[in-house]
């Protein structure tokens, strides 16, 4: 199995196949998700001291904070081959 890394900004990467969702941090449920992950010691802060612009959810229930826009990370996931079925992702966006 080939491991593909996804650049989430500022020299940080995650394994692309482990990513479940990339969401915006603006809504109240996402703020709650972030706080719950912090309490459970499953929060990874990859913002490098910058403002959180995306929240990445992994299959191991870890929450990763990124300083890069969610749309940018999603585009990188598509162009770097991290998603096996592009049509499935496009359907999820609609």
Curated annotation (Swiss-Prot):
Highest taxon above the source species: Bacteria
Signal peptide: none
InterPro entries: RemA-like
Pfam family, one: RemA-like
Cross-referenced HAMAP family: RemA (MF_01503)
Family under the similarity heading: Belongs to the RemA family.
Listed name of the protein: Putative regulatory protein Sfum_3631
Organism of derivation: Syntrophobacter fumaroxidans (strain DSM 10017 / MPOB)
């Amino acid at each position: 199995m080939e491991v593909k890394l996804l650049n989430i900004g500022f020299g940080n990467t995650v394994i692309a196949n482990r990513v479940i969702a990339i969401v915006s941090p603006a809504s109240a449920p996402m703020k709650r998700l972030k706080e719950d992950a912090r309490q459970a010691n499953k929060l990874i802060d990859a913002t490098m001291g910058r403002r959180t612009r995306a929240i990445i959810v992994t299959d191991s229930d870890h929450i990763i904070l990124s300083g890069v826009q969610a749309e940018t990370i999603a585009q990188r996931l598509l162009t770097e081959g991290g998603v096996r079925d592009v049509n499935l992702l496009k359907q999820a966006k609609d």
